[in-house]
């Protein structure tokens, strides 16, 4: 089988390419150049100069062709600019979802089909299972590396074409051992970080540079509008966090957390953590840009939902809406952050997902 492998220059995708080559497949490697702002030597970067060289070195050693696609413009528009826009609205975006769906899968899947490939493989920790009605997305064996939450926007057609060989791997140590066994020099290379395109490591500095209107101090207030302190910029906060609130914890005698971000007024609204679950949380949440990996059930579906990348599942009834969104009715109140993903699960299977909106349901 002719398979295109999306190669980031890291251990995971390199092992995927090597395994498929060893299995006798005709492998073609491809890497997207997403940016180049001195990232070649930055630990945790992805798809920059050094990574492209590492991917090409693997392809040369194993003897298969490797292509580089210049996707800087699309990446800047689809990921970086939208990332800054979201924070300027008081949301907490998930850039990895935008990158996977708006850049990587768009460009690489198109290239794979143009090259006559029968499938495209990636180094994501996801299981693809052939179900009675077609391909299904499931959590991987290695729960610590689960990336299904970040791939909820993968469409049915894309899932049919994609392959995820690492979904059955027991852990990352096993993958690194395979890399050594396969003779890959990058076996000990560090993993990429969550926000790989932030050169300084401070996402807030990037947002403030791209959207100067969010710069500047403002007030930290309680739900009654009483001023409790000052903050250094609204882009530095997200709903649910309790860090960077200064001495407010000791001033009030109760540990506080962010409940709302009022961008026009430059206000961070906080409330006591012990009371937030009842006073400021929500049992109903609206989602936008819903992607279903099952036939959208008109009457709704009872399932588990995950409203943050590393949070527990919550029981809910999810109903499709005519505007392409969905209404999530939680059995227990939660503090969803606008802009984050809400992903639906039935056991290990991903049913779909969408983005949390700021409006009340």
From Swiss-Prot:
UniProt entry tagged with the keyword Disulfide bond: yes
Function: Catalyzes the 2-thiolation of uridine at the wobble position (U34) of tRNA, leading to the formation of s(2)U34.
One Pfam entry name: tRNA_Me_trans_M
Binding site residues for ATP: 6-13, 32, 123
GO molecular function, one term: tRNA binding
NCBIfam families: PRK00143.1, trmU
Name of protein: tRNA-specific 2-thiouridylase MnmA
Single GO cellular component term: cytoplasm
Family recorded in the similarity comment: Belongs to the MnmA/TRMU family.
Catalytic residue list: 99, 196
Catalyzed reaction equations: S-sulfanyl-L-cysteinyl-[protein] + uridine(34) in tRNA + AH2 + ATP = 2-thiouridine(34) in tRNA + L-cysteinyl-[protein] + A + AMP + diphosphate + H(+)
Residue numbers spanned by region Interaction with tRNA: 145-147
